[in-house]
Amino acid sequence: MAFLPKFDSAGLVTCVTTDAVSGDVLMVAHMNDEALRKTIATGEAWYFSRSRNALWRKGESSGQTQRVVEMRTDCDQDAVWLRVEQRGAACHTGRHSCFYRKVEMAGEGGARLVFVDADRLFDPAAVYRK
Amino acid sequence: MAFLPKFDSAGLVTCVTTDAVSGDVLMVAHMNDEALRKTIATGEAWYFSRSRNALWRKGESSGQTQRVVEMRTDCDQDAVWLRVEQRGAACHTGRHSCFYRKVEMAGEGGARLVFVDADRLFDPAAVYRK
């Protein structure tokens, strides 16, 4: 059975990346054909940045790389699930996961954010300065 | 801290839904403002179907509903992570998760799909016939 990813009009599939140990969702990102190929070939996570319009090896600036334990695809092959060993933190804010806040009801149909994990594993200002 | 979802040009955020017990990724879908509000207000998962261009309560046809245990959002608030109690199967093919196949290298840079979980918990032909 061939892997035939169904790219959207921008040439991308959605990628969900989880921590292979804890199961936590670390991040949601996108991959183009080249990012998929490089991820499969190297066993390291590569993505495509929509804001920078560029291929991107996870951790190339921060050192916070992701080793792929397993890659899956969904029923219609327009999404990919990576289970990874995360080195350090996945989030550019320095948190282990990008999903470090939960959404809680706040009356009148509103909602507020509450920190689940505020700890920073690195200092973004130090890591990303050029 | 207010929850201020960052909708894309189509008015959607990406939603990753995981099984609160196993941690498995069940599905990737989208939510518009109304789907988010209804999910928060009712504690049941609502999505927006891009193919049908319609709001959709998960399980309204199949009975395979999702009770929300926790909702999180990511660093830039353009994605949501739902941890749910899945009743039956999340996938329209009858499998528990939409991610029932893994992607494996197949030499020459190619890749093939291998079933991780082929079992169907319901018969789609019976459930979705009108």
Swiss-Prot record, chains A, B:
Q: How is the cofactor bound?
A: Binds 1 Mg(2+) ion per subunit. Binds 1 zinc ion per subunit.
Q: Per the UniProt record, which EC number(s) apply here?
A: 3.5.4.19
Top-level lineage group:
Bacteria
Reported cofactor(s): Mg(2+); Zn(2+)
Positions bound to Zn(2+):
C75, C91, C98
Localization annotation: Cytoplasm
Q: What GO CC terms are in its UniProt record?
A: cytoplasm
Its pathway?
A: Amino-acid biosynthesis; L-histidine biosynthesis; L-histidine from 5-phospho-alpha-D-ribose 1-diphosphate: step 3/9
List the Gene3D superfamilies: Phosphoribosyl-AMP cyclohydrolase
**Database matches in Pfam families:** PRA-CH (PF01502)
Look up the record and give one Gene Ontology term from the biological process aspect. Answer: L-histidine biosynthetic process
Q: Name one GO molecular function term.
A: zinc ion binding
- Write down the InterPro entries for this protein, in alphabetical order: PRA-CH, PRib_AMP_CycHydrolase_dom, PRib_AMP_CycHydrolase_sf
Q: What class of enzyme is it?
A: hydrolase
Catalyzed reaction equations? 1-(5-phospho-beta-D-ribosyl)-5'-AMP + H2O = 1-(5-phospho-beta-D-ribosyl)-5-[(5-phospho-beta-D-ribosylamino)methylideneamino]imidazole-4-carboxamide
Family of the protein in this entry: Belongs to the PRA-CH family.
Functionally, this protein is described as follows:
Catalyzes the hydrolysis of the adenine ring of phosphoribosyl-AMP.
Q: How does it assemble?
A: Homodimer.
Name the chain's protein.
Phosphoribosyl-AMP cyclohydrolase
| Organism whose genome encodes this protein | Bradyrhizobium sp. (strain ORS 278)
Q: Which gene encodes it?
A: hisI
